[in-house]
Regions:
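Alpha-helical transmembrane segments of eukaryotic organelle membrane transporters
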Residues: 19-47, 52-120, 135-189
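Coil-to-alpha-helix initiation sites in intrinsically disordered, low-complexity, charged segments
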Residues: 5-12, 22, 87, 91, ...
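Transit-peptide-like, low-complexity N-terminal presequences
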Residues: 1-15, 190-221
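Short, motif-level signal for alpha-helix interfacial/capping segments enriched in acidic residues
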Residues: 80-82, 125-129
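Short juxtamembrane and helix-loop transition motifs at transmembrane-helix boundaries
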Residues: 128-136
Length: 221
């Protein structure tokens, strides 16, 4: 009777609402997913006794602004204008453009700059320079991790997903990927402590307290 048909009707209404408001859906879903991923990493992986709200804010803001707005425009408008449709050639070119151009040139510089800004509480050219210097140090590892996730997953993005579901799909995948970024690039306390002019013994003690048990900082004397 009514029970079995209620599920599809609810899903249908949700899908229709997302189709009517794709940008709002993109912003809400990607921001929530990014913040939730960092909360998961802090609680489950790093086992922190206290949630680092600055990190959660970083990933939430990053998800809502870059992924929710910028990537929405790039994926659903720019790339579709450049190579419309779902032919093998069009999908392959969009995957290549995303992984070889958009992510290295836009995604990672924005990610590192936002992280540096929220970590230090400063905004300026020097903040961007410091962020890009860190990006250069990590570029090969970051791109390797990124390509391992997004080459196969963007085949689904461009080959299967309708436009209004592309960003929710990307958000679902990036729940895991942003967690990886959080775990490998999210030690805000280390950044702040490194910039404060504290006695070496005091700084080392705080580093040891904040560091992971198996991290180089924890074992450093």
């Amino acid at each position: 009777g009514g029970g079995p048909s209620a599920g599809p009707s609810v899903l249908g209404r949700v899908n229709e609402a997302m189709r009517r408001q794709p940008l709002l859906t993109s912003i809400v879903v990607t921001g929530a997913k990014a913040a939730a991923a960092d909360l998961m990493i802090q609680a489950v992986v790093e086992k922190r006794a206290r949630v680092d709200e600055r990190r959660v804010a970083t990933f939430g803001l990053f998800g809502a602004t870059y992924q929710g707005c910028v990537q929405y425009f790039l994926f659903n408008h720019v790339l579709e204008w450049w190579r419309p449709g779902r032919s093998v050639r069009a999908v392959a070119l969009k995957i290549a453009a995303t992984n070889f151009c958009l992510d290295p040139v836009l995604f990672f510089p924005v990610f590192y700059s936002l992280r540096e800004m929220l970590a230090t509480g400063e905004l300026g050219a020097h903040t961007v320079r410091a962020a890009l210097a860190k990006y250069r140090e990590n570029v090969f590892e970051d791109l390797r991790n990124s390509w391992g996730v997004w080459f196969p997953c963007h085949a689904v993005t461009y080959g299967l997903m309708p436009l209004h579901l592309r960003m929710p799909w990307v958000a679902l995948v990036s729940f895991s990927y942003v967690g990886l970024l959080s775990f490998t690039r999210g030690d805000f306390d280390a950044i702040v402590l490194a910039e404060e002019e504290k006695p070496a013994a005091s700084a080392q003690a705080e580093f040891a307290e904040l560091a992971e048990p198996d991290s180089p900082m924890a074992s450093a004397e």
